[in-house]
A protein has these predicted regions:
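Histidine/acidic residue-rich metal-binding segments in metalloenzymes
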Residues: 1-45, 67-87, 120
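His/Asp/Glu-enriched, well-ordered alpha-helical/loop segment
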Residues: 2, 61, 71-142
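Active-site gating loops and adjacent loop-to-helix segments of metal-dependent hydrolytic enzymes
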Residues: 41-68, 108
Length: 142
């Protein structure tokens, strides 16, 4: 059975990766040690970037509060790409300002913007998505 963990911060991320989770959702506020653990693991990271990015200009939160969170997440995406961390797209659809359908489009576009290379972003996300599908596919024998 595959296991998915929803966590943020180094303690939660490191505990989840050490436990061998198959998929790590969110993973905000990671340091170098957390990223290194992910790089050495079989865990696929699903960052859900749009949950914060889509709040910019909305007025619900001050943009100056959101920008450092977004910048940190973007830097970790670039580091994860360079480190070969397995990453898959996921939008946290249904969260505030993350519409079903459009949320995943926004998420993929975020990766393209952050990496500055559409083909590289698509390949990286496709590889991670394939890994997620493999891990979470259940074969039922009747």
């Amino acid at each position: 059975m595959a296991v998915m963990a929803h966590t943020n911060g180094d303690y939660g991320v490191q505990a989840a990766v050490a436990a061998g989770v198959d998929s790590l959702e969110h993973g905000n506020y990671m340091n170098e040690e957390s990223l290194a653990m992910l790089a050495e693991s079989d865990t696929v990271w699903v960052p859900t970037l749009v949950t914060v990015r889509n709040l910019l200009g909305d007025g619900r939160y001050d943009d100056e509060t959101l920008k450092p969170i977004i910048e940190s997440a973007e830097e970790n995406i670039r580091k994860a790409f360079r480190m070969g961390i397995k990453v898959a797209p996921g939008s946290d659809a249904g969260a505030y300002r993350v519409l079903h359908g459009k949320g995943i489009q926004d998420e993929v576009q975020s990766f393209v913007e952050i990496l500055g290379d559409q083909d590289a972003a698509y390949r990286w996300l496709a590889e991670g998505e394939a890994e997620i599908k493999k891990k979470f596919t259940v074969t039922v024998h009747w």
